[in-house]
Amino acid sequence: CQLLLALRPENCGTFFFENGLLPDTTTLDPKGVNYRNSVPRDAAFYRSYRAPDGAAEARSQLIPRQPRNKDLEPVSLPERYVFIPFQDDRDTQVRLFSPWVGDMRQLFALGKRLAVESGLTVVFKEHPSSRESYPDLHAEAHDKLLFANGNPTQELIQNCEFVVTINSTVGLESLLLGKPVMTLGQAFFNIPGLVVHADSANELLESARGFPNWPLEDEVRHGFLRYLAAEYCIQGAWRDADRAQLQRVARRMLALTGSA
């Protein structure tokens, strides 16, 4: 994207298309995607946000991602645990927007330290489309540090105490399901009252020790999700686009260029 932006003619507008931030939606943003998108970052905006009459609402049913390995068996989950989803090391979310966690082995090391120093059980799940394999990390797993690659992500979110993520879509899905989230990287949803954020291992451990007394606000979370569903996301997934969805995209493009 940055190369294309550098090569574009002067005064040439841009639109960025991406998978939708909510289930069964599409992203169309004139500024960028992920951390570079145009979603407001001000908690006060969401505290006072009111969706237009008849606007779409966020769905709380996630759409499962198909794993590369379809022979994975679910594991029995402990009664209390922290969920840490892996991301794809090659993705820009990690390469560009993760200042202090360079890859999933570093993320695993943080989870391991969290389990040792806090006594919490930590459950990991590898990214379903990642080409990386981690036999060395699986060899370190035990009853307080385990992988649940065969379990549905929604189950792992709903049954955990809280979610720790760099900046994954799983963090956004966790907000959708009403779970507390701690981010470690640059995420567009790093908004006070919406998530807690850690810029170091020490901050991660300190926040974990402070759970559940985190400064989170339901009002901010509800306003954030209402805004995404009502105004930011375009209803319908681009992979299954029909005429109506293409018309919604066209209307959004016209509105953003002032041509509507």
Protein language model features and the residues they cover:
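Generic beta-sheet signal
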Residues: 15-18, 125, 166, 184
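A short helix->loop->beta-strand "cap" motif at the edges of active sites that frequently abuts
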Residues: 10-14, 120, 179
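Catalytic donor nucleotide-activated moiety binding site of glycosyltransferases and closely related
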Residues: 108-147
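Mid-to-C-terminal functional-domain signal that highlights helix-capping/loop sites
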Residues: 92-107
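Active-site and donor-binding regions of nucleotide-sugar-utilizing enzymes
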Residues: 1-39
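Short loop/turn segments at strand-loop or loop-helix junctions that form parts
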Residues: 19, 79-93, 126-127, 186
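A donor-sugar binding/catalytic signature common to diverse glycosyltransferases
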Residues: 1, 150-197
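Leloir-type glycosyltransferase catalytic cores
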Residues: 32-79, 194-260
